[in-house]
Regions:
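Short, charged/polar surface micro-motifs in flexible loops or helix N-caps
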Residues: 21-24, 51-52, 78-81
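N-terminal helix-turn-helix DNA-binding core of bacterial DNA-binding proteins
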Residues: 2-43
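Exposed loop/turn and edge beta-strand positions of beta-sandwich/beta-sheet ligand-binding modules
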Residues: 69
């Protein structure tokens, strides 16, 4: 049975990073850099969010020679909807990939 509780601070951080470019497939190492989360925290979060249906996951179709294929992730339609609701509840503005997250100003 799945618990229905709000995402943790780490999950929210990951979701907000993914929401900057929701259609883009991202690999774990890239996400560790952008979120600041350690791999031991990030990969279980990715698995949990995928199990909830908030993320889509797939293996890289072709990997460069000398490197194994990466597991790629992106927000699902449900995940994007839930992330936007979470951002609104936390008064966070999701900016483009190049920008950082920032709290909304009162009256904005």
């Amino acid at each position: 049975m799945q618990r229905n509780r709000p995402p943790s601070k780490q999950s929210a951080s990951l979701l907000f990073v993914l929401a900057r470019d929701p259609g883009a497939w991202r690999h774990g190492y890239e996400l560790t850099i952008e979120t600041g989360l350690k791999a031991g925290t990030l990969y279980p979060l990715l698995a949990r969010l995928a199990d909830r249906g908030w993320l889509e996951a797939q293996w890289e179709a072709t990997a460069p020679q000398g490197r194994p294929p990466r597991h790629l992730y992106r927000l699902s339609t449900t995940g994007l909807k839930e992330t936007r609701a979470l951002a609104a509840a936390q008064k966070v503005t999701i900016l483009s990939r190049r920008a950082r997250l920032r709290p909304q100003r009162e009256g904005a």
